[in-house]
Structure formats: C-alpha cells, structure tokens
C-alpha cells in the first residue's frame, strides 16, 4: 500500500445518488441468508448493496480508528512514528512501507446504520500512480468495490511547460508531491458520485485493510 495513515473514521453521510452512468449488473446475484437476519444478503456488486441498505438510518456519530492503534498486522513492513514533509509532519501515525501485508483494527459501533469511511493518509513515493487497498469487515468483503479501494496521489509538473526548438509547447514529466490528504472512499467504477456506504450493526467489529498495489 505504501502510505502513512493517521485515521480511518466511519461517519454518517447524506444519501448518495447514482450518476447517469449505466450500471454493470453482469455479475449480480442475490441470495437470502436462510435462518439469519433477513437484512443480510450475499452481495456481488455495490449497486445492489446500495439498493438494499441506502434506506437504513444514518446515525449522527463518528467512529474513529487512529492508524497507529491497530489490533494486529500480517506481512508487509509496518511501523509507528512521525511522517510528512517539513511543516506538514504528523506524529504517531502508521507507516506502511510496502505494497503487501494487511492491518486489522477493532472498533465498536454504538448504533446500527449506514456509515461512510474517510481516510487521512500520506502516500509514500513509489512508481505506482495510485494506492490500491482491499477492505474487509469482519473477515468479509461487503461488495466487490470494497476489494478495489483506490486512493489518489498528488502529482505536479516537474518543471514549467516550455517551448522546444521547433516552437512546440512541451508538457514536462509529472512527479509525486508529498502531502497529507483526506478523502471519503469512493466508487472506483464511477457509477456513484457520493461516498461508498457500509451498513454496520451495533457491536464490535474488525476492519482489515490489505495492500493490493
């Protein structure tokens, strides 16, 4: 994943809207979980998950999970310390300096309902254009998009646009510009404009983040 992480807060968010883009339902199947809470169904696409849970209550609470206060890690290269640029450094953050590995967090939900997740992170410098993660809640992926969480990096021109010997404008190469960033987790497929939603029952849960790229 190659990033430093300060926090993963879950919070309620206003109802999301679908964009005008067409939905891909080719992988969609829904099966009832017999003998269990009928609210839970097996989901394969975020679109179907949204249809089931978007009408649920949205508690006015925030659940904070500081990046450095993880429950356990597996594989990868993890440490806790200070990270950032001069004037923009943060203390006591999780430093995930590898593309592989996973980190687990325990958290408690006081009120059942729909939540959104927001990450505060600093991308480490790598050749990858984005950071890709997979998210599990209680050991399961709630929908396919959760296995393809994408965090952007900040890119800037290496130098100003210039004119070559033939009078043509030349756009310079892009380089990564390190900075702390905060973003709600979004639908990587672009079918939904607003943050991804997660239905959480009251009680204790485990959040697992795994490095993909």
Stretch-by-stretch model annotation:
Residues 1-13:
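Sec-dependent N-terminal signal peptides of Gram-positive bacterial secreted proteins and lipoproteins
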Residues 15-213:
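Extracytoplasmic
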């Amino acid at each position: 994943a190659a990033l430093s992480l300060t926090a993963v807060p879950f919070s309620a968010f206003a109802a999301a809207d679908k964009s005008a883009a067409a939905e891909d339902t080719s992988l969609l199947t829904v099966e009832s979980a017999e003998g269990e809470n009928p609210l839970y169904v097996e989901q394969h696409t975020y679109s179907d998950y949204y249809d089931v849970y978007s009408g649920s209550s949205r508690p006015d609470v925030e659940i904070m999970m500081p990046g450095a206060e993880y429950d356990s890690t597996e594989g990868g290269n993890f440490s806790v310390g200070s990270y950032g640029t001069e004037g923009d450094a943060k203390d006591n953050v999780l430093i995930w300096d590898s593309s592989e590995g996973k980190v687990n967090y325990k958290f408690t939900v006081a009120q059942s309902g729909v939540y959104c997740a927001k990450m505060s992170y600093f991308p480490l410098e790598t050749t990858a254009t984005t950071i890709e993660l997979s998210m599990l809640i209680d050991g399961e992926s709630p929908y396919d998009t959760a296995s393809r969480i994408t965090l952007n990096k900040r890119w800037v021109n290496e130098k100003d646009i210039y004119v070559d010997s033939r009078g043509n404008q030349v756009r310079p190469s892009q380089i990564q510009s390190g900075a702390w960033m905060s973003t709600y987790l979004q639908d990587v497929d672009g079918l939904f404009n607003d943050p991804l939603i997660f239905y959480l029952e009251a009680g204790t849960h485990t959040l697992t983040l795994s490095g993909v790229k």
